[in-house]
Every structure is written in structure tokens, then in C-alpha cells.
């Protein structure tokens, strides 16, 4: 099955990678430069089932709310406040998305405006998922079913239009909250990046389109650009 990384387009990928590397306590590494790209992408590999993050150079401006955002977990109220204080010290800002005062999570934006939440302690859904507990996405049930099959990750939640999947080894959950969705806006500044198993990109494209993806184009870096059943672009690398 393909390996999943979450890619962020960024005006300053090195700075954004430093923010997330420090917040997540990870070691950044430079990706090899693809053809036509002059600024390096930076990868924050995940371990023990935690999603990896990739930051790629782009001049595209952020428009509206992202269709996916990260959830960081907390072990106590004090731990939640420490995470928030650390994030603010690194350049994050508080964000009002209409959350109610009685809700325990804290909504922040990273230095390029990407939303993320620091979840309150005692959240049973994210118990045992690790510090990067969840990637929360917009999307109907068919999107979750597609990604479950595409990644070989079983459904761990399937209620109404809400779905969630998790690697068989545990770790970060990927969840879709059902409608209403935020509008799909191109170009897609956040996306799933997949690495084809064994480097066989052509065979993997065939498998993914057979599951319901749509072929879009070949990118300049040699990756295949596809669209999932929810209209979200993703890339498949060799």
C-alpha cells in the first residue's frame, strides 16, 4: 500500500517547517529537488504511526478555511496550556472560527494561517493516537471509504456521513466530518502525498482510479496528480 504524507504549500517552507518541527519535536530533512524547483521542500517524517508532513514552496495565497487541519492532543489542562504557549511563542495566533466558550479545544493558526486545534485532555476518540492525534478533513462518507481502501487503513468510525480511518499499526487518525463541506478551491494548498509501493507509479494509478479516483495530469516533478471522490487533489510520487 502507498505511504501517506500531508503536504502544505508555503510561501516560506523552511520557516513553516521549523515551526512544526519545534512544535512536534521532529527533525526536518530536505527533500531532493524535483525538476524545475529551485527552493527545497522540507519533510518532517512521522514515526510510530504519526503522519509525516511536507512543506513545499508556493506563491499561492491562502483563501478561506482549509479543508483539513491537525489536532494535537493533551495529557492534562496544564499540558494543553503548555502546547498553546509554545505554539504562540513560535509564531502561531489565536483563531476565532465560531467555537463556543464551553468547548474545550483551542483553535490556533500557524505562521502561514493554517488552522490547527489543541484538543483538551480526556478526549476518548483520540486516546492512544499520539501527540499528532488526528487530521480532520471535510468530506462525505464516500471520501472516507475511498481512502480506507486506497491506504489499506480500516475504518475506526463510520456513523452517518462521518468516517475515520487509522493505520493498522495505530497512530494518527484521519477523519472526515461529513457535509457541509468548505468549498474546494484550486490550487490545493494542502493535499495528500502518496509514495507508490515499489516505485510502480503506473500500476498504483490504475489501482487508485479503479477505486474511484480521477486522473488529472502529470506534474512537473514527475508525480501523478489525481482527484479523490470529494474533489480533492492528491499526488502520487514514484
Regions found by a protein language model. Give the residues of each.
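Glyoxalase I/VOC metalloenzyme domain signal
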Residues: 1-33, 37-39, 43-96, 109-160, ...
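Short, small/polar residue-rich loop motifs at catalytic or cofactor-binding pockets
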Residues: 101-103, 219-221
Amino acid at each position: 500500500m502507498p505511504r501517506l504524507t500531508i503536504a502544505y504549500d508555503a510561501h516560506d517552507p523552511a520557516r513553516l517547517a521549523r515551526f512544526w518541527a519545534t512544535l512536534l519535536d521532529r527533525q526536518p530533512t530536505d527533500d531532493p529537488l524535483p525538476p524545475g524547483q529551485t527552493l527545497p521542500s522540507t519533510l518532517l517524517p512521522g514515526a510510530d504511526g504519526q503522519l509525516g508532513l511536507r512543506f513545499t514552496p508556493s506563491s499561492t495565497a491562502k483563501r478561506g478555511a482549509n479543508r483539513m487541519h491537525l489536532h494535537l492532543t493533551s495529557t492534562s489542562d496544564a499540558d494543553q496550556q503548555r502546547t498553546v504557549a509554545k505554539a504562540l511563542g513560535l509564531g502561531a495566533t489565536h483563531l476565532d472560527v465560531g467555537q463556543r466558550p464551553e468547548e474545550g479545544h483551542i483553535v490556533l493558526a500557524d505562521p502561514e494561517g493554517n488552522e490547527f486545534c489543541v484538543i483538551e485532555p480526556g478526549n476518548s476518540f483520540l486516546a492512544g493516537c499520539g501527540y499528532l492525534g488526528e487530521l480532520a478533513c471535510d468530506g462525505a462518507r464516500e471520501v472516507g471509504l475511498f481512502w480506507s481502501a486506497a491506504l489499506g487503513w480500516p475504518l475506526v468510525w463510520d456513523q452517518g456521513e462521518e468516517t475515520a480511518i487509522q493505520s493498522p499499526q495505530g497512530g494518527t487518525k484521519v477523519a472526515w466530518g461529513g457535509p457541509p463541506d468548505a468549498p474546494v478551491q484550486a490550487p490545493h494548498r494542502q493535499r495528500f502525498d502518496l509514495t507508490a509501493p515499489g516505485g510502480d507509479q503506473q500500476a498504483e494509478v490504475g489501482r487508485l482510479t479503479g477505486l474511484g479516483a480521477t486522473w488529472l495530469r502529470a506534474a512537473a516533478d514527475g508525480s501523478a496528480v489525481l482527484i479523490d471522490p470529494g474533489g480533492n487533489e492528491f499526488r502520487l510520487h514514484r
